[in-house]
Amino acid sequence: MTDAIMPTYGRQNISFVRGEGTWLLDSEGKRYLDALGGLAVIVLGHANKAVAETLSDQSNTLLHTSNLYRIPKQEQLAEDLKRISGMDNMFFANSGAEANECAIKIARLYGHKKGVDNPTIIVADSSFHGRTLATLTATGNRKVQAGFEPLV
């Protein structure tokens, strides 16, 4: 293993070199069921032809632009999600930490608007919600929080 990667996780000494659907293959060809999906960030399966084709098509058109501008495909996805979820609008995040940070901010804003003086965010023991200061504060694991005090 290399020390060039910051030791944020206790990495297992397994090298995955490719995937097929729900399976990961290591450098020796051994198959493992992918029960984590990139810590549930990309649960799309591996080497999914439809996903790969869609990504390729989009990357040949436009990879990314700022949310300072309108993004038609993002707007269409938001409309579709609004219709099937019953929610009023959507927030697109770049990571789980950013999504959790936004959820905390929305909860606080809601509490503020309702006149809650001292809002409390409830989290589970041994949980992990991200590496930002707010999500680290919400993480129910003192070991992960150690060294980052004072938390928010």
Where are these regions (language model features)?
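N-terminal glycine-rich, Lys/His-bearing helix-loop that initiates the first secondary-structure elements
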Residues: 1-89
